[in-house]
Amino acid sequence: MSAPINKEKVEQEAEQQIHKIRITLTSTKVKQLENVSANIIRNAAQYNIVKKGPVRMPTKVLKITTRKTPNGEGSKTWDAYEMRIHKRVIDLQAPASTVKRITQITIEPGVDVEVTIAA
């Protein structure tokens, strides 16, 4: 007869399993983005985690051109506005519990963080 399966043991094994984690950082402010990515890399180095990055993805430039005058009278002058969106990708290979500790840092306002876990 087989021994009953211990649920705690199964949960611990699943938690210690190494996952591929991708952290995507997006912001319009480069300095804040670099600070957050440096903090994540620094924390990953403390736990001796296999890491790749931060990989700098191409900057998206959103442009809008509008007429200066609201009624169409006068000379045809235009205003051009643009917003630059910067993106960084960091790949980690670690257990999920360790990644929770790494990502519990203070994230500066204006920086969006997306964490995806692959088995």
Swiss-Prot record:
SMART domains: Ribosomal_S10. InterPro entries: Ribosomal_uS10, Ribosomal_uS10_CS, Ribosomal_uS10_dom, Ribosomal_uS10_dom_sf, Ribosomal_uS10_euk/arc. GO terms for biological process: translation. Keywords: Cytoplasm, Ribonucleoprotein, Ribosomal protein. One of its GO terms (cellular component) is hyphal cell wall. It holds the Pfam family Ribosomal_S10. It comes from the Eukaryota. It is found in: Cytoplasm. GO terms for molecular function: RNA binding; structural constituent of ribosome. Its main location: cytoplasm. Transmembrane segments: none annotated. Component of the small ribosomal subunit. Mature ribosomes consist of a small (40S) and a large (60S) subunit. The 40S subunit contains about 32 different proteins and 1 molecule of RNA (18S). The 60S subunit contains 45 different proteins and 3 molecules of RNA (25S, 5.8S and 5S). Belongs to the universal ribosomal protein uS10 family. NCBIfam families: uS10_euk_arch. Component of the ribosome, a large ribonucleoprotein complex responsible for the synthesis of proteins in the cell. The small ribosomal subunit (SSU) binds messenger RNAs (mRNAs) and translates the encoded message by selecting cognate aminoacyl-transfer RNA (tRNA) molecules. The large subunit (LSU) contains the ribosomal catalytic site termed the peptidyl transferase center (PTC), which catalyzes the formation of peptide bonds, thereby polymerizing the amino acids delivered by tRNAs into a polypeptide chain. This is Small ribosomal subunit protein uS10.
